[in-house]
Curated annotation (Swiss-Prot):
This is Large ribosomal subunit protein bL12. The gene is rplL. Disulfide bonds: none annotated. Keywords: Ribonucleoprotein, Ribosomal protein. Belongs to the bacterial ribosomal protein bL12 family.
């Protein structure tokens, strides 16, 4: 009996971050591969000025400071990222840390607003 691709995607989508990490390790062991990202060097030369003129489309939301109300900030981080309680607490305790990466401007602004409403200091890069 073959498993449909949709069933696999649904099962993976329902997993926690910890379960996904264990799954990746199992794939690495079973197939002898690495999940490390491959770094690709960009073209060198005089094109640097043109790249700066392009509008940025992906943003990173950085938690700068947790503030006085850590519990609310941890709840906001969990809501934004889907992390478990311990992972969210570690992220908040380790500030400054990125909360969301490579997101559109609207999503980044919304995440920053939620963090600030919870009492944290956040910035968008």
């Amino acid at each position: 009996m073959a498993i449909a691709k949709e069933d696999i995607l649904e099962a993976v989508g329902a997993m926690s971050v910890l379960e996904l990490n264990e799954l990746v390790k199992a794939f690495e062991e079973k197939f002898g591969v690495s999940a490390a990202a491959v770094a690709v060097a960009g073209p060198a030369g005089a094109g640097g000025g043109a790249a700066a003129a392009e509008e940025q489309t992906e943003f990173t939301v950085i938690l700068s400071e947790a503030g006085a109300n850590k519990v609310s900030v941890i709840k906001a981080v969990r809501e934004l990222t889907g992390l478990g309680l311990k992972e969210a607490k570690d992220l908040v305790d380790g500030a400054p840390k990125p909360v969301k990466e490579a997101v559109p401007k609207a999503a980044a602004e919304e995440a920053k607003k939620k963090l600030e409403e919870a009492g944290a200091k956040a910035e968008i890069k």
